[in-house]
Amino acid sequence: MQSLSLNSSTLQSPSMALVLIRPETETTGPSTSSRALQEVIAQLAQELTHNGQLDESSPLGKLLGKAMAASGKAGGGLEDIKAALDTLIHEKLGDNFGASADNASDTGQHDLMTQVLNGLAKSMLNDLLTKQDDGTRFSEDDMPMLKKIAEFMDDNPAQFPKPDSGSWVNELKEDNFLDGDETAQFRSALDIIGQQLGSQQNAAGGLAGDSSGGGLGSPVSNTENSPGSLGDPLIDANTGPASNSNSNGDVGQLIGELIDRGLQSVLAGGGLGTPVSTANTALVPGGEQPNQDLGQLLGGLLQKGLEATLQDAGQTGTGVQSSTAQVALLLVNMLLQSTKNQAAA
């Protein structure tokens, strides 16, 4: 019996060893993304982090929050946010996305950020509508993006005839259901905008300053007398004053170029409009105004920059084309913009 006991103990030892080893083999290893993509992910993670945790007030923040909750990482810190972003980008944009970016210059790094933002915006369009009975339903969480798409449809009635409610914006307010015909119209708009975002993703070189590059930002970068980008203040206003933003971040440069363009438009006599001009007068030395006023001011400059961009784009495209370019720019900008400041802008 003693010999049997010894043999049993011996047989159990390898089994116990396997139990101890298994957690190590199942532990997630370091990111396999290219160094350039990891830098982009780090910048985005900083923009999405508030007080050490994920800020879910933006569309991208909400999407990432759901992904982290599904993987048991809800409430995680910066490293968890980076890991979740890494996974999300490869799920949406492909396993090999960004693989060749390490050999790119600073311009290529900037282009990679643009590709990520356009690609994520495009992928989010695919998830806005969920099939239900003979139509589709949508979530209230996606209303900021849905509203911009509905406004695009209302601006192009020849392409998208008005529904019974009188406008597509009103249609979204009635309930969260679209019937078969309404779904077909909405999906048509999503396809058009998705194609624009795809084109911008593929032609991401436009942000580097080559006005012939096309895609997102090319009209904005064609500002030879521009004093330079204003950087990240708009993102600070969007994600919160305590946000850990990167002063040289590509997202800040993208939005900064639009703000620069808006400022040039205002100086040329374009005006900011009543709500923003109220905030503008508050920036007198010694005056104190809440952060919301700053968000409204910068949001107004951003809007003016978009309008100026479209005015330039109108020389090569009109109607639905220029309108599509506008809504695509807005959707990309909204990815990191908090819901509160979307309303202010």
Curated annotation (Swiss-Prot):
One GO location term (cellular component): extracellular region
UniProt keyword Zinc, yes or no: no
Compositional bias of kind Polar residues: 219-228
Sequence repeat segments: 213-219, 269-275
Oxidoreductase among keywords: no
Gene Ontology biological process terms in this record: monoatomic ion transmembrane transport; symbiont-mediated perturbation of host programmed cell death
Annotated region (2 X 7 AA repeats of G-G-G-L-G-[ST]-P), positions in chain: 213-275
Main localization (coarse): secreted
Region feature Disordered, mapped onto this chain: 202-247
Bias type Gly residues, positions: 206-217
Swiss-Prot/TrEMBL keywords: Host cell membrane, Host membrane, Hypersensitive response elicitation, Ion channel, Ion transport, Membrane, Repeat, Secreted, Transport, Virulence
Function: Harpins are proteins able to elicit hypersensitive response (HR) in non-host plants and are required for pathogenicity in host plants. HrpZ forms ion-conducting pores permeable for cations. Such pore-forming activity may allow nutrient release and/or delivery of virulence factors during bacterial colonization of host plants.
Quaternary structure (record): Homomultimeric.
This protein's domain notes: The glycine-rich region is characteristic of harpins.
Family membership: Belongs to the harpin HrpZ family.
Protein name: Harpin HrpZ
Gene this protein is translated from: hrpZ
